[in-house]
Design a protein with these regions (language model features):
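Conserved AMP-binding loop of ANL adenylate-forming enzymes
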Residues: 108-152
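Conserved beta-strand scaffold positions in the cores of enzyme catalytic domains, especially
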Residues: 86, 122-124, 245
Length: 380
């Protein structure tokens, strides 16, 4: 706990030391900021629309806009109101993405003793690694960019091949992935749950076997991107047996947290990897003057909107997620939803976490297995 708080204090100081020499830092007088209280006064919370003018300057070739130099990559995401978003990944922030994924796997192997999981073939179900250039900066989906960050010692066991990964049409790509993996010694499979389910269905359709029978040494499933629980029963039914699952919390804006233990609830917050975290009570996020809390001020069981400041050049940035701490020593959290994912046709304010919990209870009572779902208010 105390190491995490010290790390956060040190990161804020490092961010301010570099940030004050950027256009953003000069616009917000970061040179005069001495502590977190001063930081909150100088740097307002912002969404992508308020960040966009700085991103446009970077696209036009300007240096030292949000962070020193220029980004190594733009991670491209689809925004609901802002259109396509271009999130910078810098030379300083790039290690956050790969090293955190590595740390999650290392924690798993250290706790479980399952070192054999690293000896076989591993598949990362991801977007295309082919990148375009925007403002002369390599640009693509985060999962595609991540393929360029994987070191050679991991590539030896990585599937699918680069050529297959570059296929844009998902159905064609999935068939090719099945071709390449069907007779391999797969020990680890990674991806978002819906993609893994489609892969498992295609494997079973081709082989007539459960995934666990097809890959007898498969024992680790790594997932992230969406809540795992609604998909869990169907995925394990497709596998045909239990395997260990490692949950991760990657985002284009940074690798936020990862499951460091198979025995404890929640994901370990990534407190020493170039991100200074802030938390806003979820009910206040759309107010004009929301309460902003540092890590040492959070409480267990309360819903917070997650705000990040990072060496990617993100400042007071609202990534749109809500989280809830389940432990403060160490700092472990669960993702409870998106700040805009709620239904309130009659002022009921039903959030994503509540919908998912209700679905889990209902599916358990009815013996149902959920593959995918959509929720919306229907007023007759």
């Amino acid at each position: 706990m105390y190491t995490a708080l010290a790390d956060q204090d040190a990161i804020l100081k490092q961010l301010l030391a570099t940030g004050q020499r950027t256009d953003f830092g000069k616009d917000h007088n970061l040179e005069a900021v001495k502590d977190y209280q001063g930081f909150k006064q100088a740097v307002p919370i912002r969404d992508y629309e308020l960040l966009k003018p700085y991103i446009e300057q970077i696209k036009q070739g300007r240096h030292n806009v949000l962070w020193k130099g220029r980004p190594m990559y733009f991670a491209k995401t689809s925004g609901t109101t802002s259109g396509t978003k271009y999130i910078p990944i810098t030379k300083d922030s790039v290690d956050n993405h790969f090293n955190t994924a590595r740390n999650a796997f290392m924690c798993y192997m250290s706790e479980s003793g399952n070192y054999a999981s690293a000896a076989g073939k591993m598949i990362f179900l991801s977007g295309s690694p082919e990148l375009e250039r925007v403002g002369d900066i390599p640009t693509g989906r985060l999962s595609g960019i991540s393929n360029h960050l994987i070191p050679k010692y991991v590539r030896t066991n990585q599937l699918p091949t680069y050529e297959t990964n570059c296929i844009e049409d998902w159905e064609t790509k999935l068939d090719k992935i099945v071709d390449e993996t069907l007779h391999q010694n797969m020990t680890m499979i990674s991806g978002i749950p819906p993609w893994m389910q489609m892969y498992f269905d295609r494997l079973t359709a081709r082989s007539g076997k459960k995934v666990g029978d097809l890959f007898p040494n498969f024992n680790v499933l790594v997932h992230g991107g969406v809540n795992f629980e609604p998909y869990k029963a169907k995925l394990f039914d497709s596998i045909g047996r239990q395997v260990d699952a490692i949950e991760t919390y990657p985002a284009s804006e940074g690798f936020i947290a990862f499951q460091d233990s198979q025995k404890e609830e929640g994901l370990l917050l990534n407190t020493n990897s170039g991100i200074f975290f802030e938390f806003v009570p979820a009910a206040e996020i759309f107010s004009e003057s929301p309460t902003r809390l540092s890590l040492k001020e959070v409480e267990v069981g309360k819903n917070y909107a997650l705000i990040i400041n990072s060496n990617a050049g993100l400042w007071g940035y609202n990534i749109g997620d809500t989280v809830k701490f389940v432990s403060l020593n160490p700092y472990r959290l669960v993702v409870t939803g998106r700040i805009k994912h709620f239904i309130s046709a009659f002022g009921e304010h039903v959030i994503g976490e509540e919908v998912e919990h209700a679905m889990l209870v209902a599916s358990a009572q009815l013996g149902a297995r959920i593959v995918e779902f959509t929720v919306a208010p229907k007023i007759a």
